Amino acid sequence: MVSETKTTEAPTLRRELKARHLTMIAIGGSIGTGLFVASGATISQAGPGGALLSYILIGLMVYFLMTSLGELAAFMPVSGSFATYGQNYVEEGFGFALGWNYWYNWAVTIAVDLVASQLVMSYWFPDTPGWIWSALFLGIMFLLNWISVRGFGEAEYWFSLIKVATVIIFIIVGVMMIVGIFKGSQPTGWSNWGIADAPFAGGFSAMIGVAMIVGFSFQGTELIGIAAGESEDPEKNIPRAVRQVFWRILLFYVFAILIISLIIPYTDPSLLRNDVKDISVSPFTLVFQHAGLLSAAAVMNAVILTAVLSAGNSGMYASTRMLYTLACDGKAPRIFSKLSRGGVPRNALYATTVIAGLCFLTSMFGNQTVYLWLLNTSGMTGFIAWLGIAISHYRFRRGYVKQGHDLNNLPYRSGFFPLGPIFAFVLCLIITLGQNYEAFLADTIDWGAVTATYIGIPLFLIIWFGYKLTKGTRFVRYSEMDFPERFK
């Protein structure tokens, strides 16, 4: 696919993302509505133990995926990322489908974040129409990406810094509450893990059922692959960012879910559930309310709003760059390949903004229903992208070795090959196919829910095989793979 680093007279993407930008994108890029808003649903539906185990398993899977992506991105740092790798090391139609799938994934995720902004703002302004907030925040995201890649990087750096600091404070307060040393609190210990059907409410099927929501929480981790195409010294900075992933997963997700489950019973109706109308108060806010910090709860809601803007900002960046790359390769209308003087693909940005604007439909159909529908749809397409990363890395490494290249020449090498990509592929596949399987066992099948859950699979296959049949493409043989000694 396109190489953004060739020197031409025409404007090109600029490598203006510094090491600190890339590091904060890796640490905080995926800390958003999935963790702050939707995490309560996982505890409510699967129980504290089921939710925690789901986060641990998927967190391990994501870590393996990021080591795979780190190896690929450090070797070939392009904004097309795994869509480029899928084309070069698997099959051209496969890369084409991955690119469009990922663009759709983030375009929908922006809409999800805008819906979440309505829910957060209703905490303070319950009588204000939600579409007003969506329009305002969509405009902010648009402007941050319209200015320059540095504008995106700086905004994401400070957004992520606020989120990271907040989660650390949340963990400290939560631990103090659990052990009973917080002022006015009684130690909770592990008592909430023994009520009703806890800790594994619903058993294995419930864990599979919430896995897609957990997957949505981790979406954005792969943004370092997209940002590689505009980062300074990617061979050095990408490995550094990848090494941050494990500790982020351990601290920001696993610890946060554990603390929420220890303080708030999974039977608490305030947690996000399908039959609860008010989902504007997140589990993080509820924890501060339990601590008696009522003013801090309002501050936490503001932080959640920052997280929503951050996730939407990242989504706007990722989808715009992917659409630009597709256009440069002739796989999308050429108009989207045009860059501004500052190296911003603004036509691609305009198109993505229009699609994200469909979130305004939520004011017509009801926030909760549309929010959960978009959440599941986006989660499925995200898993497909991760499957693409695992497959691309496996074939990349196999081809690299078969052609006699020295692994020591790789700027970064995943230490878990072939276990890492195989484990990630198998777990991704199980969750993708097993999601919402209980719908088929019911007396009456809810085809609306089934469609929302699985629509990403047929869309991906139609795009892939439609391109393959039209263009007559075939799988790339190991002997035909191109491995330049240094990609500039």
Give the positions of each predicted feature.
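Membrane-interface "cap" regions at the ends of multi-pass membrane proteins
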Residues: 1-40, 44-49, 63-67, 79, ...
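Helix-loop-helix junctions that connect adjacent transmembrane segments
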Residues: 7-13, 52, 125, 129, ...
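Helix-loop-helix connectors at the membrane interface of multi-pass transporters/channels
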Residues: 9, 83-93, 114-134, 166, ...
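Extracellular loop-to-transmembrane helix junctions
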Residues: 13-14, 38-137, 141-143, 248, ...
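Membrane-helix boundary/coupling elements in multi-pass transport proteins
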Residues: 78, 101-116, 213, 218-231, ...
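TM-loop-TM module centered on a large, flexible mid-protein loop between adjacent transmembrane helices
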Residues: 84, 91, 123, 197, ...
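Membrane-interface loop-to-helix entry segments
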Residues: 131-189, 219, 242-246, 250, ...
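C-terminal membrane-solvent junction of multi-pass transporters and transport-like membrane proteins
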Residues: 158-159, 336-343, 386-452, 481-485
